[in-house]
């Protein structure tokens, strides 16, 4: 055999190794393990995502605390205004009582019929002047007073029973979360009357005057 014929002969050992004893070809196995560079890039992305999520959670927590403190201050302010309003309404109610008692001969609410009877024959001309809640015309101009009057009569603004009246629920704050917690508690005590269901403690007896 010449040198040329020897060079033309191709090795077939590798191909024969891929053929099994049964005569079927065995497929080549490919590696599924990612390269080191790919694993490194994936790790960096995971770390970046974790940092972004942690930063967002921290911002949300700070915003929640800020809104909570702001709400506490607003509730305390509302309670203080409610206390002042209740004190003012009590003062108006008492002034109406004083006016009724100081005008036995008549007033702008009941009229002035007794003026014509002052020179008459004594007891025959006397009559009793009875005042009711409807005579408190100034107090009736207050929305809060009307609500308290409806509650005393067994009615509520939403048409349901007294237990369904959600206006009775007072705003409150946890004293441990606010520096003014003790102040809030004192305000709630002033707003809550004794022996009544959320209404100011006022005298409700009918007043009788004689001329």
Curated annotation (Swiss-Prot):
Residues 201-211 have a biased composition (Basic residues). The gene is EAF6. Residues 9-33, 174-185 have a biased composition (Polar residues). It comes from the Eukaryota. It comes from Candida albicans (strain SC5314 / ATCC MYA-2876). GO terms for biological process: chromatin remodeling; DNA repair. Disulfide bonds: none annotated. It is found in: Nucleus. PANTHER family: CHROMATIN MODIFICATION-RELATED PROTEIN MEAF6. Component of the NuA4 histone acetyltransferase complex. The keyword Nucleus applies. Component of the NuA4 histone acetyltransferase complex which is involved in transcriptional activation of selected genes principally by acetylation of nucleosomal histone H4 and H2A. The NuA4 complex is also involved in DNA repair. Keywords: Chromatin regulator, Coiled coil, DNA damage, DNA repair, Nucleus, Transcription, Transcription regulation. Belongs to the EAF6 family. This is Chromatin modification-related protein EAF6. Residues 1-64, 152-211 are annotated as: Disordered. GO terms for cellular component: NuA4 histone acetyltransferase complex; nucleus. Its main location: nucleus. Residues 35-49 have a biased composition (Basic and acidic residues). Residues 61-90 form a coiled coil.
């Amino acid at each position: 055999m010449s040198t040329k014929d020897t060079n033309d002969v191709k090795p077939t050992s590798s191909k024969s190794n891929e053929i099994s004893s049964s005569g079927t070809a065995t497929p080549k196995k490919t590696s599924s393990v990612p390269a080191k560079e790919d694993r490194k890039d994936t790790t960096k992305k995971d770390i970046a995502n974790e940092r972004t999520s942690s930063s967002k959670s921290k911002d949300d927590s700070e915003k929640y605390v800020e809104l909570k403190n702001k709400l506490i201050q607003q509730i305390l302010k509302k309670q203080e205004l409610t206390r002042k309003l209740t004190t003012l309404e009590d003062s108006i109610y008492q002034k109406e009582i004083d006016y009724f008692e100081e005008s036995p001969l008549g007033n702008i609410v009941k009229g002035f019929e007794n003026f014509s009877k002052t020179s008459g024959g004594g007891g025959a001309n006397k009559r009793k002047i009875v005042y009711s809640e409807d005579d408190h015309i100034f107090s009736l101009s207050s929305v809060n007073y009307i609500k308290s009057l409806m509650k005393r009569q067994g009615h509520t603004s939403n048409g349901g029973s007294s237990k369904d009246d959600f206006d009775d629920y007072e705003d409150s704050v946890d004293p441990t979360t606010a520096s003014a917690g003790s102040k809030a508690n004192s305000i709630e005590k002033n707003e809550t009357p004794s022996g009544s269901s959320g209404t100011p403690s006022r005298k409700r007896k009918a007043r009788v005057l004689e001329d």
